[in-house]
């Protein structure tokens, strides 16, 4: 897939919301959608209009040929999520073609997943489940209310191999497993509406924090085989461009496996490696 294949036009500009897009996977997805000519709303907790990380993401979307719109939103607050969707509906005449549920919040005092669950405070639930699962459900409800009347749309959850094997922490795995089940069950209730739900498992991602550490590998995984945030975005664009994607609704897909299926390579031309064998298998729902 070439850059030309990803480019859209103003006349057919679609509308996406990518939550948690200040950096890493969310930023990569937003930028790839920008290359495809989408209008992309990007959210984060940081202020907008001050040349912060969220503004820079929106700026890249626009530079790529899309239209980036930065919106400050604390996804722990249902009312802010509702206001966000109301603004999109008002500004885009009710149109929303894609929601990417990506926002994540670290627990209070987080310094890495270094302690077993019984040594962590109960408040971890509020971040890892409250934002990492509940906020995605709230956003999905609001998105479905916009998409179903138009008989089209896609809801994408950014999940993890932590669904399949232990990764990071108990609550992290619980939240990701919940996202996969949410996509599967939403697909059942959305059947016949034209709205597609998917969950994605990126592998090891070469994000800003990972690269800043200057590592050659992370917990045994070579960074040379890892994927960039924008690779995940290119897979999302490819799925959105598939006219038969609704037939996959409810599935969980591994990005490193979906990429070759759609002819998607990473920004450096490499093909990331799937971690399926490392975690003892693939997704429980499709894939």
Question: Which sequence ranges carry the predicted segments?
Answer:
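Canonical Rossmann dinucleotide-binding motif of NAD(H)/NADP(H)-dependent dehydrogenases/reductases
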Residues: 8-45
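Active-site loop of short-chain dehydrogenase/reductase
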Residues: 13-14, 66-67, 94-96, 147-160, ...
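Rossmann-fold cofactor-recognition segment
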Residues: 61-78
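Conserved Rossmann-fold SDR core element
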Residues: 95, 180, 190-205, 244-253
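Catalytic loop of short-chain dehydrogenase/reductase
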Residues: 105-109, 116-124, 128, 154-192, ...
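A short, exposed helix-loop element centered on a Lys and neighboring polar residues
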Residues: 140-141, 184
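C-terminal helical subdomain
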Residues: 199, 219-287
């Amino acid at each position: 897939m070439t850059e030309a294949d990803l480019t859209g036009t103003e006349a057919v500009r679609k509308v996406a919301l990518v939550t948690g897009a200040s950096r890493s996977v969310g930023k990569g997805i937003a930028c790839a959608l920008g290359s495809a000519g989408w209008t992309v709303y990007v959210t984060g907790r940081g202020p907008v209009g001050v040349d912060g990380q969220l503004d820079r993401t929106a700026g890249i979307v626009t530079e790529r040929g899309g239209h980036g719109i930065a919106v400050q939103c604390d996804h722990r607050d249902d009312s802010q999520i509702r206001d966000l969707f109301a603004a999109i509906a008002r500004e885009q005449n009710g149109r929303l073609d894609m929601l990417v549920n990506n926002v994540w919040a670290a627990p209070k005092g987080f310094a890495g997943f270094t302690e077993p669950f019984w040594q962590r405070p109960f408040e971890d639930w509020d971040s890892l489940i409250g934002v990492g699962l509940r906020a995605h459900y709230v956003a999905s409800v609001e998105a479905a209310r916009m998409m179903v009347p138009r008989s089209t749309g896609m809801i994408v959850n950014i999940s993890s191999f932590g669904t399949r094997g232990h990764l990071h922490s108990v609550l992290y795995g619980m939240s990701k497993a919940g996202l996969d089940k949410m996509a599967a069950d939403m697909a059942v209730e959305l059947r016949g509406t034209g709205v597609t739900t998917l969950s994605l498992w990126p592998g090891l991602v070469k994000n800003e924090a990972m690269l800043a550490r200057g590592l050659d590998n992370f917990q045994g995984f070579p960074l040379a085989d890892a994927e960039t945030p924008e690779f995940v975005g290119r897979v999302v664009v490819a799925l959105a461009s598939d006219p038969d994607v609704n037939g996959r609704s409810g599935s969980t897909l591994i990005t490193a496996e979906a990429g070759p299926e759609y002819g998607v390579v990473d920004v450096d031309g490499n093909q990331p490696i799937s971690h399926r064998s490392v975690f003892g298998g693939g997704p429980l729902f499709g894939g």
